């Protein structure tokens, strides 16, 4: 089952400075990690662009999703990453559930060199890059991210494995393209104008999500909710969309009914929505 989250490129538009913008994006990445999101998609919102350069949101989120031991190798120094020190740690669990220091744990690495002898050098957070044989059924290239199973650190015993990397992927795509993916599942728009979520409705949502093989949940930006971004009248959205609506969602939901604040920030909406929508029966 695939869980995808869509956020706009204008996500940090109201932040006063780059530090605050980076901190805000860190909370978004943290929500994606906590709720085991598989894919975090940044969709364009040119009309809501703020003071930050094009690509800033995607770059910071990609950096946050990169395992700490690979960040220097993959990113170096970039202006957009000036304040990444304020990002919260994600502490993404490995696919095995083992800690990164445990025997038999899975670690992500980056291929730094491909040899002619069927071996590669991989930086996977050990003291030095390690040389590993490439399994016959694998084809890897320099710069590629790979999964390494470490069975011992002293002496080093490790091997490349054909396993999915942990954490979530960050991609950029148009909203229409993201909603029309084969693995999009149940498509949900999070909006204060949507149908209020109730305890009775949650069971129905979980059943429908599982039947669809996952879900895609979209969010708006500060002072620019999804109706504004999509140029849709707020009173035109509701719960189930029974016809071919231009917005392309199966459901419009309000996961913070009776909100006590005039504005629910996007990062707050992520936690509120994913808490409800990832519940199981």
From Swiss-Prot:
Gene3D superfamilies: 3.40.1280.10, Nucleic acid-binding proteins (2.40.50.140). Transmembrane segments: none annotated. It holds the Pfam family Methyltrn_RNA_3. Coiled coil: none annotated. SUPFAM superfamilies: alpha/beta knot. InterPro entries: Alpha/beta_knot_MTases (IPR029028), NA-bd_OB-fold (IPR012340), Put_MeTrfase-C9orf114-like (IPR003750), tRNA_m1G_MTases_N (IPR029026). This is Uncharacterized protein rrnAC1612.
């Amino acid at each position: 089952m695939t869980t995808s989250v869509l956020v706009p490129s204008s996500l940090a538009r109201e932040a006063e400075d780059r530090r605050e913008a980076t901190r805000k994006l860190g909370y978004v990445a943290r929500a994606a990690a906590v709720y085991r999101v598989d894919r975090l998609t940044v969709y364009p919102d040119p009309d809501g662009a703020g003071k930050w350069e094009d690509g800033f949101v995607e770059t910071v989120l990609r950096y946050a999703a990169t395992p700490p031991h690979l960040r220097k190798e993959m990113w170096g120094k970039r202006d957009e990453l000036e304040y990444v020190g304020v990002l919260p740690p994600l502490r993404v669990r490995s696919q095995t559930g083992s800690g990164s220091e445990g025997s038999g744990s899975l670690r992500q690495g980056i291929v730094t060199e491909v040899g002619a002898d069927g071996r590669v050098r991989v930086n996977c957070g050990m003291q030095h890059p390690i040389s590993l044989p490439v399994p016959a059924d694998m084809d890897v290239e320099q710069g590629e991210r790979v999964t390494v199973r470490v069975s011992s650190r002293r002496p080093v015993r490790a091997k490349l494995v054909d396993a999915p990397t942990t954490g979530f992927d960050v991609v950029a795509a148009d909203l229409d393209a993201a909603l029309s993916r084969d693995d999009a599942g149940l498509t949900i728009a999070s909006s204060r104008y949507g149908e209020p979520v109730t305890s009775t409705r949650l069971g129905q949502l979980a059943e429908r999500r599982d039947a669809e093989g996952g879900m895609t949940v979209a969010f708006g930006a500060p002072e620019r909710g999804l109706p504004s971004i999509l140029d849709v009248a707020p009173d035109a959205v509701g719960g189930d969309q029974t016809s071919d609506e231009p917005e392309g969602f199966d459901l419009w939901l309000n996961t913070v009914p009776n909100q006590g604040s005039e504005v629910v920030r996007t990062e707050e909406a992520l936690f509120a929505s994913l808490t409800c929508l990832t519940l199981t029966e």
